[in-house]
Amino acid sequence: MITFEGVEKVYESGGQKVHALNGIDLHVDKGEIYGVIGFSGAGKSTLIRCVNFLEKPTAGKVFVGGRDLMSLSKAEIRTVKRKIGMVFQHFNLLNSKTIFANVAEPLALVKTPKADIKKKVTELLRFVGLEDKARDYPDQLSGGQKQRVGIARALATNPEVLLCDEATSALDPQTTGDILKLLKRVNEQYNITILLITHEMNVAKEICDKVAVIEKGRIIESGSVFDVFSAPETETAKSFVKSAIDHEIPESIQKLNLKHLYQLQFVGESSGKPFLSQVSKRYDVEVNILHGTITELQGIPFGSMTVELQGEDGEIGRALEYIRRENIRIREV
């Protein structure tokens, strides 16, 4: 649905060339929720703005729905952009207009008949849970309600793609969760492809199918949410994952200088097995649990535990082999 091929974006600043995007290759399948995560200045916003041509790439190709935007005329680009909705960080609502008028704005701009506008806007306000706010104004709404209006407005033209630019970063955690659930409903009910950029790994963890990590204008790691969260490869990805799932041993434990420390990662059915008690029963090994966490990734239980194994080296070795046979990943700390 969305493809970047060798995309570059270069700005001139003080006589110097600044590469905001540097050789971006990325593919988002139709109906997917794809997250791009990175720190401030990594190139996230520039990347997403290339999809609706608010930014024109310096080099490379951007395909939306199979069409290369770089080869289209201005009129053709306008046609493609009508199938792309956008949700902004700070809502971008018109304060002088009612909620109904804000959602209706994209339809009014293309001279949609008034009866069709009323029907569509009413449907969308009902969908986002704000049907009773149609006559209100933006300053009468909470932040979460304003973002619901922004989502309804973005859906007004029946887009095939929805771009979300830090759509939850101005919201509190509870409201963030509500907005993410709404975006998931948008994806499922309307079969809309969502490209979402964020600096919050928890956002990607909650609703994305796949995620890419961007740093200094380059994609440094990408894959399914499960793969990136369970086995991050780069230091930047590890840092983001740590913010959502803390695998690290507390510093107070590290100071004890314990031996035979192992991090165990278990997935799916193995998450519910009492394998540690079995280790103690089968082998002359004591298990000291130092740290642990369990969460869900794409509906699959995923846990991590740091343990100290106490006993003779031979017994510890046999215990580790047993744990591996239970399909549990082991990493010596």
Curated annotation (Swiss-Prot):
Keyword Iron: no
Entry's Gene Ontology cellular component terms: plasma membrane
Reactions accelerated catalytically: L-methionine(out) + ATP + H2O = L-methionine(in) + ADP + phosphate + H(+); D-methionine(out) + ATP + H2O = D-methionine(in) + ADP + phosphate + H(+)
Subcellular location: Cell membrane
InterPro entries: AAA+_ATPase, ABC_transporter-like_ATP-bd, ABC_transporter-like_CS, ACT-like_dom_sf, MetN_ABC, MetN_ABC_transporter-like, NIL_domain, P-loop_NTPase
Keywords: Amino-acid transport, ATP-binding, Cell membrane, Membrane, Nucleotide-binding, Translocase, Transport
Gene3D superfamilies in alphabetical order: 3.30.70.260, P-loop containing nucleotide triphosphate hydrolases
SMART domains (UniProt xref): AAA (SM00382), NIL (SM00930)
Keyword Transport: yes
Residue ranges of every copy of the ABC transporter domain listed in the record: 2-241
Highest taxon of source: Bacteria
Residues annotated as binding ATP: G38, F39, S40, G41, A42, G43, K44, S45
One MF term in the entry's GO annotations: ABC-type D-methionine transporter activity
Main location: membrane
EC number: 7.4.2.11
Topology of this chain in the membrane: Peripheral membrane protein
Function (record text): Part of the ABC transporter complex MetNIQ involved in methionine import. Responsible for energy coupling to the transport system.
Assembly information from the UniProt record: The complex is composed of two ATP-binding proteins (MetN), two transmembrane proteins (MetI) and a solute-binding protein (MetQ).
Family that this chain belongs to: Belongs to the ABC transporter superfamily. Methionine importer (TC 3.A.1.24) family.
Protein name as annotated: Methionine import ATP-binding protein MetN 1
